[in-house]
Amino acid sequence: MAGSQLKNLKAALKARGLTGQTNVKSKNKKNSKRQAKEYDREEKKKAIAEIREEFNPFEIKAARNKRRDGLPSKTADRIAVGKPGISKQIGEEQRKRAFEARKMMKNKRGGVIDKRFGERDKLLTEEEKMLERFTRERQSQSKRNANLFNLEDDEDDGDMFGDGLTHLGQSLSLEDELANDEEDFLASKRFNEDDAELQQPQRKKTKAEVMKEVIAKSKFYKQERQKAQGIMEDQIDNLDDNFEDVMSELMMTQPKKNPMEPKTDLDKEYDIKVKELQLDKRAAPSDRTKTEEEKNAEAEEKKRELEQQRLDRMNGMIELEEGEERGVEDLDDGFWENEEDYEDDNDGIADSDDDIKFEDQGRDEGFSQILKKKNISISCPRTHDALLDQVKKLDLDDHPKIVKNIIKAYQPKLAEGNKEKLGKFTAVLLRHIIFLSNQNYLKNVQSFKRTQNALISILKSLSEKYNRELSEECRDYINEMQARYKKNHFDALSNGDLVFFSIIGILFSTSDQYHLVITPALILMSQFLEQIKFNSLKRIAFGAVLVRIVSQYQRISKRYIPEVVYFFQKILLTFIVEKENQEKPLDFENIRLDSYELGLPLDVDFTKKRSTIIPLHTLSTMDTEAHPVDQCVSVLLNVMESLDATISTVWKSLPAFNEIILPIQQLLSAYTSKYSDFEKPRNILNKVEKLTKFTEHIPLALQNHKPVSIPTHAPKYEENFNPDKKSYDPDRTRSEINKMKAQLKKERKFTMKEIRKDAKFEARQRIEEKNKESSDYHAKMAHIVNTINTEEGAEKNKYERERKLRGGKK
């Protein structure tokens, strides 16, 4: 077992002859001459260094010997590759020398430093750079001592640059004159003696001399400006003194006015023509005549664009100008922005596209005579009562004629403000159509039909130009209808409400996912179908008309309305159940019927031809007739036709068609079993069976993914393996790039390491300098305090001695 470190150190020193007995005398006196030392001084230092390295293994960086020869041993496995301690010390010394050199050269290096603002900034223009430089120069000047070179204060001039300067930079003192004379004499003498030196360049002026010249010139120019200003002020004062005299002379002589010559008629006509030409609309260049193929292509493109816009509205997505899409919730925001821009463009245009044109543009002389005979004046009514005052003396067939005359008389091109008047009149015309629908017209049904169709046609033409006013009026009417229904329920509804729902389906797009008029109307109709108690034939007929209108709304968009399905189930069940205690068909126990008195008897003859159309004027008389069975059958047939149309146009394309039609299919089967001669439900069932065959209904299931195989990592063998080759990339260019990247990474890592070492060293040096300055300061202060204390103590002792002496004398 090895001994301690101390014993090993003594043994190593003794083995190298550095310790032990060195003055042993030789027994042979013959050879007693002084021998040379076994180790000289250099060898001794080398031996000590080897011993130090041997006993301090941490001072040497060792690495594994990859190419060792001979027997394995503890020391042969590792070889010395460096001395980190010495390397660190050398690095510290180099950094210290560099730091001292930078410290010595600080603020002593010459050269021109470009400190101008924004010189290398490419984003700034030349004007911005000059403005910012001027601003910074002003700020730097304001920060300096304001009185350093103050031109107004002459007292500071002598403090810094000698005696004060006066006019033209010359001093008035006698000493300056003597000094100047002496200098002139010396200068003339020097000029005669040293003529050759005049050819050499003059010496550079000092800063003090330059500033003296600048201040002298500034004061001289300032004095000249003051003189010029004084002269100008004197001239102004003289002019002010003579101003009143000059103006009084000018007022005495008034110029003669030339009398106005009257214009001739020819000149007046010329001026009028010029005014008319200025006010006339400029002629626009006409487009070239297009061929029939081009016209058809433009028409097809326009139709395709409109259809795409309709599909986008139906899907609830509208694209903005910036490219982003907005959904249903954003449609109400800025709905009329484009129309307002369109109105602003067309204001003041005499012949604009807002003019309403009819097929019969000619003047009806016969109707004009009727108006004159009955003393009816044409005016554009702003309310429905005003329109009723105009048409109360006319027949029902003359209502469209007077409406057309009003529109012709108030075309937008005729006068300013007619456009707003026709917008109001469009809303009034809608109210008038609803008003006529609520009247009793059993005696003149055909006349009412012609008048109603003509007024609706006119309203459709007006809606294309005044859509905003009409939409606002429709929304107001929907709110009124809802308020009436909330207060009086079904009794508040009328035939005019059904006509209103039909008209807006013609005027507006019903396929939009959200519309300012159609969507509230559809919600209100669904509320009626859900909440109305269908306990009378009139109410059922009213609901049948509503269902027909709703189905007409959804013929394009094909959206599922649950209230329609509920209405069909409830009405079909109402007509088949006669008594309250009668057993209902399966799956309809949860439907509560409003009446059990409308059930059809078993002996109803369905082979008899009956009308399936429900005229609106017959709704009021349905419950008053004595034999309502035929009317019940007519209403049932109307409901069956509505069901057939809804299945064909709306439901068949829905993915849940089987689930929607299943309860209705059971009711139709009950009708076929109870009434064998009833062909309509049997035909509907056959259609449903055919549609069910073509309807592919796939139930929901999880997505079936392909199973992922477990990755196998087989070892890769290189046939031509070379341990010296680090990369097996066949692409030589890529291999060189990777090699360069690795080298850059290594250099970057080494550079960052050196930068961190330099930063840490500089931080340590700055801390040492601060500590040294602090210690010097404290030592200096301590020395001063000790000196003061010593002087105070000496003075105190002196005072005590004097006091004692004075006390002894007493």
Swiss-Prot record:
Its main location: nucleus. Keywords: Nucleus, Ribonucleoprotein, Ribosome biogenesis, rRNA processing. It holds the Pfam family Nop14. GO terms for biological process: endonucleolytic cleavage in 5'-ETS of tricistronic rRNA transcript (SSU-rRNA, 5.8S rRNA, LSU-rRNA); endonucleolytic cleavage in ITS1 to separate SSU-rRNA from 5.8S rRNA and LSU-rRNA from tricistronic rRNA transcript (SSU-rRNA, 5.8S rRNA, LSU-rRNA); endonucleolytic cleavage to generate mature 5'-end of SSU-rRNA from (SSU-rRNA, 5.8S rRNA, LSU-rRNA); maturation of SSU-rRNA; maturation of SSU-rRNA from tricistronic rRNA transcript (SSU-rRNA, 5.8S rRNA, LSU-rRNA); ribosomal small subunit assembly; ribosomal small subunit biogenesis; rRNA processing. Residues 35-44, 68-77, 793-810 have a biased composition (Basic and acidic residues). The keyword Cell membrane does not apply. It comes from the Eukaryota. It is found in: Nucleus, Nucleolus. GO terms for cellular component: 90S preribosome; mitochondrion; Noc4p-Nop14p complex; nucleolus; nucleoplasm; nucleus; preribosome, small subunit precursor; small-subunit processome. Involved in nucleolar processing of pre-18S ribosomal RNA. Has a role in the nuclear export of 40S pre-ribosomal subunit to the cytoplasm. Interacts with snoRNA U3. Interacts with EMG1, MPP10 and NOC4. Component of the ribosomal small subunit (SSU) processome composed of at least 40 protein subunits and snoRNA U3. Belongs to the NOP14 family. This is Nucleolar complex protein 14. The lineage of its organism: Eukaryota, Fungi, Dikarya, Ascomycota, Saccharomycotina.
